[in-house]
């Protein structure tokens, strides 16, 4: 069978690499892909942009694609799944209406309130004055979010009132995030530990993936601006079996039932970004309608189930008949980024030192890379993800940093403490 994966990041390289392990899969087309997917056995890049819905549909028809997996959020919010359904093509992802869970933060907060799903107290604003009055009344720290999609960067955690006021003015007057910031959500600052809780949903049944923890801030010890993610590890020890059960009962099931009850049944990967507070109460910070990036990379390293079979079961509404199996080892992925990221950065720098042979339990997934005249060059802010398995998070971390050490280009940087919370827990034991 032929498979299509939509996207060009590290997440799509990891999904493609995993899908290629299915013996019945002949070719996995990646649209548009990157230098890593171009080199991966069974994978082939196709020059179609993720926003080109008509082009993707035409290609899937032409190649008789039997499964399409959507990586990024943009095509979901544009309705790629609806278009494939109309053409009678099998695709795993939420419809345009269901993708509002990620596409609009205001929609999500109102949805959570309607279904009594735990989240931070909040208010939505389109005008500057009432928004400023609200933050002055609430005080800092407080969180200001652009309503629409802002590539994971439209969230300002304001530690002072001045920062909050500046963020509101930027988003509502200066329009720092374009269309995404024409409405803001202001919410209480939650204290606790974050976890990424990703599940597969077929409309009613839910299959949990491995837990993970992402590192959003650009700098060590969680300093500097938010990014799309600088590294992740799996499993996340903060999600104990008891908390796992609470998340399923208090967050995931009510979300899936609520979406179905409102006429937007949810099919696809559903990612709940959670804050686990001191007494183990999970609160929803955000939803993503897709697998996380970079969480996908360490999670796929641990996945022992067949990803293609799971996606096909979900499309057939049979997720209750399959199970997910995981390598008991820990996995960690470290993002290698271009100097300047998440602000302006260089493109076109030649990358050297990429591993020539695959070693069990180690993998460099490509994100912002392209082939130029026989060289692999940088083509994005997050360029590569050095990923490794280990018997503990500290062992996985050591292997991943050893792998990262061999790779270089002008201006490359990475965080040096990915996994620090889990490692602190291991050391306490």
Swiss-Prot record:
Pathway: Purine metabolism; IMP biosynthesis via de novo pathway; N(1)-(5-phospho-D-ribosyl)glycinamide from 5-phospho-alpha-D-ribose 1-diphosphate: step 2/2
Main EC class the enzyme belongs to: ligase
Region (Disordered): 212-234
Encoding gene per record: purD
Protein name: Phosphoribosylamine--glycine ligase
One example GO MF annotation: metal ion binding
SMART domains in the record: GARS_A (SM01209), GARS_C (SM01210)
Biological processes per GO annotation: 'de novo' IMP biosynthetic process; purine nucleobase biosynthetic process
Cofactor: Mg(2+); Mn(2+)
Binding site for Mg(2+): 286, 288
EC numbers on record: 6.3.4.13
InterPro entries: ATP-grasp, ATP_grasp_subdomain_1, PreATP-grasp_dom_sf, PRibGlycinamid_synth_ATP-grasp, PRibGlycinamide_synth, PRibGlycinamide_synth_C-dom, PRibGlycinamide_synth_C_sf, PRibGlycinamide_synth_CS
Signal peptide start and end residues: none
Ligase as UniProt keyword: yes
């Amino acid at each position: 069978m032929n498979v299509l994966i939509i996207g060009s990041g590290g997440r799509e390289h990891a999904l493609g690499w995993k899908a290629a392990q299915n013996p019945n899969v002949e070719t996995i087309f990646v649209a548009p892909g990157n230098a890593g997917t171009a080199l991966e056995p069974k994978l082939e890049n196709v020059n179609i942009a993720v926003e080109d819905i008509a082009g993707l549909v035409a290609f899937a028809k032409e190649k008789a694609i039997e499964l399409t997996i959507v990586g990024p959020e943009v095509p979901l919010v544009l309705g790629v799944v609806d278009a494939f359904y109309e053409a009678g093509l099998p695709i795993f992802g939420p419809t345009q209406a269901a993708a509002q869970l990620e596409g609009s933060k205001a929609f999500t907060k109102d949805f959570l309130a309607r279904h009594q799903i735990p989240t931070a107290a909040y208010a939505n604003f389109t005008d500057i004055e009432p928004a400023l009055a609200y933050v002055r009344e609430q005080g800092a720290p407080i969180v200001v979010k652009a309503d629409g999609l802002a590539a994971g960067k439209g969230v300002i955690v304001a530690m002072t009132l001045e920062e909050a006021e500046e963020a509101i003015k930027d988003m509502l007057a200066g329009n720092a995030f374009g269309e995404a910031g024409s409405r803001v959500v202001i919410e209480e600052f939650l204290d606790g530990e974050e976890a990424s809780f990703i599940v597969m949903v077929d409309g009613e049944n839910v299959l949990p993936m491995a837990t993970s923890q992402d590192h959003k801030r650009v700098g060590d010890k969680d300093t500097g601006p938010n990014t799309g993610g600088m590294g992740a590890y799996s499993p996340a020890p903060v999600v104990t079996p008891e908390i796992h059960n609470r998340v399923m009962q208090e967050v995931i099931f009510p979300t899936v039932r609520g979406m179905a009850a409102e006429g937007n049944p949810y099919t696809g990967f559903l990612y709940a970004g959670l804050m686990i507070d001191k007494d183990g109460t999970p609160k929803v910070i955000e939803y993503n309608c897709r697998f996380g990036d970079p969480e996908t990379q360490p999670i796929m390293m641990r996945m022992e189930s067949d990803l293609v079979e799971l996606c096909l079961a979900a499309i057939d509404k049979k997720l209750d008949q399959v199970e997910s199996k995981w390598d008991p080892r820990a996995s960690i992925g470290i993002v290698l980024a271009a100097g300047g990221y998440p602000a302006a950065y260089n493109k076109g720098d030649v990358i050297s030192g990429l591993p020539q042979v695959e070693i069990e339990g180690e993998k460099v997934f490509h994100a912002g890379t392209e082939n130029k005249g026989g060289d692999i060059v940088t083509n994005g802010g997050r360029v590569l993800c050095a990923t490794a398995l280990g018997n503990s998070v500290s062992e996985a971390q050591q292997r991943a940093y050893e792998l990262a050490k061999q790779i270089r280009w002008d201006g490359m940087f990475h965080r040096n403490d990915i996994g620090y919370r889990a490692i602190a827990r291991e050391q306490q034991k």
